[in-house]
Amino acid sequence: RLQEFYNAYTNMIFTRKWLRIYLYSGLKGLDINRWYVGVVQDEILTRVIGECRHEAGLPSHNKPTAAELEMAWVFHSGIFYYGVRKYIYESPVLEDKEQMISDALDAFLAGYEKVFGSAVNLPRAPVKAVG
């Protein structure tokens, strides 16, 4: 399901126009950028984390930790930056976007299980969000 979602999601946002508007709105400090970041975190990344927890047999009803959210942002941002490199910087990228997404998903899911697999409920040093 994540592969299908990210294929469809990137089909919508991977245009030079969309990426330029998004990036410029962030540089200008416009509310639309902050709103969209909130939507991505609340509607996409939180659900991705819930699915990861479910797959790992962990409780999925708890709010994501700061560390989980950061790892999900790193994953999501890597896919996003592929579009920036291709459509804004016009840099060479792997032409098979679906393969890039599949590889990113494999790395993220394996990494999630390695980092959080059985440690979500164990006490950890608090992670403080900055900004």
Segments and roles (model prediction):
Residues 24, 34, 55-106, 115-127:
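Hydrophobic/aromatic-rich alpha-helical bundle segments in the mid-to-C-terminal region
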Residues 27:
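Short histidine/acidic/glycine/proline-rich micro-motifs that form metal-
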